From Swiss-Prot:
Domain annotation EF-hand: ranges: 261-296
Name by which UniProt lists this protein: Probable pectate lyase C
InterPro entries named in the record: EF_Hand_1_Ca_BS, Pectin_lyas_fold, Pectin_lyase_fold/virulence, Polysaccharide_Lyase_1
Gene responsible for this protein: plyC
Protein family: Belongs to the polysaccharide lyase 1 family.
Record's compositionally biased regions (Acidic residues): 373-386
């Protein structure tokens, strides 16, 4: 038990911080991430790569909730390394939100991270052989409505001793050639992948080993390296694969599932595959046989992992993914192009070696900083609505719900449910 939580319980709070989910709608292995709830507020006030008021400075210390008084593109030269117990609330940015461009991020050992509504676009100028997002150690993290693209090794990779991680409602796109990988998901500590879009990655969409729940995802236009790669290893794996839709695109030359073996144990249910690239979404359910699932060892009983609240059909998953995933409070030009590719139902899409073909990170409307009289990160007009005081810096005080007031405000800006 965390010391902070133990102290809270000793003074008789009527709710337990540890019992809260990270935000309404958080699911899976990482749903109980605490983030910076027991720390301090940090307001990002500029688009600089470093220094006071920058995003890099914001995530450099533990126990922070990060909000934004500015929108736009933050160009970074070096990788961003995130500290423990940090919450990043990209939905609080004005205008078109935040894109971080030019290099990747490390969340290794960033225990209890909560990351929402932000675009992380690495690009050709980023460090060679590095991921757009990497997690090699650490526990209890959740990534929600993130748009991540253009990794130079993997795009979103989880490995090593990392445990209790959720990636939900996220776009994982266009790992750059020649590697062009969606990502390794290779840890025995538990990873939930719910309602995500993997698109335009030559391989590893994802490559899974260990404990994994892969539910209601859409995989589009994978290349010859493979769609869902089932372990390809003598290490034991135990996965649920439920309600997903695999759609071939112009670059697709292999079937949806590859490289399974007797060590990869999969519970499979109602997964669809549309291989014909004819401009119409008309796939069929994959029969429950090892030959349809890359030779993995199929099991009859679903693994008892923390599940989605509502399990969609594959068709519902496609509708949801094309409408709402990624940093979708305002979709930028990159995500708009990617979604248009999916909705071509096989006729559009490409593997890229340079983000210039997508127009780079594009331009974002920075919006206007809100009036915040007490400087606590919550705009004055919102404070009245949520019951805090616009003249007192009280954003980190706990509401009766157990969330801080700043979390209450941020949660109110975006949908709390997907069904």
């Amino acid at each position: 038990m965390r010391l902070g939580i133990a102290l809270f319980s000793l003074i008789g709070l009527c709710h337990s911080v540890s019992a809260l989910i990270a935000f309404p709608g958080a699911e899976g292995f990482g749903a109980n991430a605490v983030g910076g709830r027991q720390g301090e507020i940090y307001v990002v006030t500029n688009l600089n790569d470093s220094g006071e008021g920058s995003l890099r400075d914001a995530v450099s210390a533990t126990d922070r909730i990060v909000v934004f008084a500015v929108g736009g593109v933050i160009e970074i030269s070096d990788r961003i390394v995130v500290s423990k117990r940090v919450t990043i609330l990209g939905q609080t940015a004005p205008g078109d939100g935040i894109t971080v461009y030019g290099n990747g991020w490390s969340f290794s050992n960033a225990d209890d991270a909560i990351v929402r509504y932000i675009r992380i676009r690495m690009g050709k100028v980023g460090d060679s052989g590095k991921d757009a997002i990497t997690i090699a150690e650490g526990s209890t993290m959740i990534f929600d409505h993130v748009s991540v693209s253009w990794g130079r090794d993997e795009t979103f990779s989880i490995s090593g001793t990392a445990s209790n991680i959720t990636i939900q409602n996220t776009i994982i796109a266009q790992g750059l050639e020649t590697h062009s990988c969606g990502g390794l998901i290779q840890t025995g500590g538990g990873v939930s992948l719910f309602r995500n879009l993997y698109i335009d990655n030559k391989t590893r969409n994802p490559k899974v080993k260990g404990v994994n729940d892969f539910t209601n995802n859409v995989v589009y236009n994978w290349g010859g390296g493979g769609g869902y790669i089932a372990g390809d290893s003598s290490g034991d794996s135990y996965a649920n694969i439920i309600g997903n839709y695999f759609i071939s695109g112009p670059s697709t030359s292999v079937t949806a599932f590859t490289r399974g073996n007797e060590y990869f144990h999969g519970y499979v249910e109602t997964n669809y595959y549309d291989p014909d690239r004819d401009g119409t979404l008309n796939g069929n359910e994959l029969g429950v046989s090892a030959s349809n699932y890359g030779g993995m060892a199929l099991v009859d009983t679903k693994y008892d992992y923390p599940a989605v609240e509502y399990q969609m059909t594959p068709g519902e998953a496609v509708n949801y993914v094309t409408g709402y995933v990624g940093a979708s409070k305002v979709r930028d030009s990159v995500d708009t192009q990617l979604i248009a590719q999916v909705k071509s139902w096989g006729t559009k899409g490409e593997l890229i070696s340079d983000e210039a073909s997508m127009g780079g990170p594009g331009d974002l409307d920075g919006g206007s900083p809100p009036t915040d009289s007490d400087g606590d990160g919550i705009p004055d007009d919102a404070e009245t609505e949520i019951g805090s005081d616009p003249n007192t810096a009280d954003s980190m005080e706990l509401h009766s719900s157990g969330y801080t007031y700043v979390e209450m405000w941020a949660n109110s800006l975006v949908p709390s449910s997907y069904h």
